[in-house]
């Protein structure tokens, strides 16, 4: 559990290894590049920036640590 920490936006980082209990997939954050003047910019978050990890029990606790680490 020593590598369990929060990633960008105070969401669980890769060390937490949260998995979807139904699909068994690891959840990872993604980044995207926005090219201006080509397409409209989305003004709402798509979920990866949220502080709670997809409702699977992984959330940030005190001192921005994942709580609980074992999802």
UniProtKB/Swiss-Prot annotation:
The keyword Metal-binding applies. It comes from Casuarina glauca. GO terms for molecular function: metal ion binding. The gene is MT1. Keywords: Metal-binding, Metal-thiolate cluster. InterPro entries: Metalthion_15p. Coiled coil: none annotated. This is Metallothionein-like protein 1. The keyword Transport does not apply. It comes from the Eukaryota. Metallothioneins have a high content of cysteine residues that bind various heavy metals. It holds the Pfam family Metallothio_2.
